[in-house]
Design a protein with these regions (language model features):
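Double-stranded DNA-binding cores of transcription factors and transposases
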Residues: 84-88
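Extended, low-hydrophobicity segments enriched in charged/polar residues
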Residues: 1-83, 102-142
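Alpha-helix N-cap recognition
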Residues: 96-101
Length: 142
């Protein structure tokens, strides 16, 4: 069985490393996230949703890296919660999770970033999804 390999160095990326946050070496500071688990998530997502649409798929898939100009980071916030973010969008901003970054990666794979459906691209095109208004707590209902 042969393996299809995705190396994002071979793709045109719109990522901008100048927009990355400052990374620190100490615990609690923002650090680059190890890529191995993220690349497995990306591979599984591509296999589940997109493999046969735009890739020459030969039974298995391997993803080598993130698109150039992008970085996944991890840090611990003031409340002690571990926070994962992704950076490098050409218009700034950050994805709040790796999963919300995946639609942009898929757009890069397709070569069609102009029609990307990720949260940041929709926001910059003025098509952002409005925040959902939560219902009032039961004790405030009359």
């Amino acid at each position: 069985m042969s393996c299809t390999t995705i190396d994002f160095a071979d793709y045109v990326s719109d990522g901008d490393s100048r927009l990355w946050p400052i990374l620190g070496p100490n615990r609690g500071q923002r650090q680059a996230q190890p890529l191995a688990p993220l690349l497995v998530v990306l591979r599984d997502y591509i296999l589940a949703h997109h493999a046969l649409r735009f890739l020459p798929f030969n039974g298995s898939l391997r993803v080598l890296n993130l698109p150039p100009g992008y970085i996944a980071t991890v840090y611990t916030n003031a409340k002690g919660r571990v926070v994962h973010t992704c950076h490098g969008h050409p218009r700034g901003g950050q994805w709040a999770s790796f999963v919300s970054f995946i639609p942009h990666i898929i757009a890069i794979l397709r070569g069609d970033v102009a029609r990307c459906g990720c949260v940041l691209c929709l926001r910059h095109r003025g098509q952002g999804i409005p925040a959902r208004k939560l219902p009032r707590p039961f004790w405030q209902i009359r």
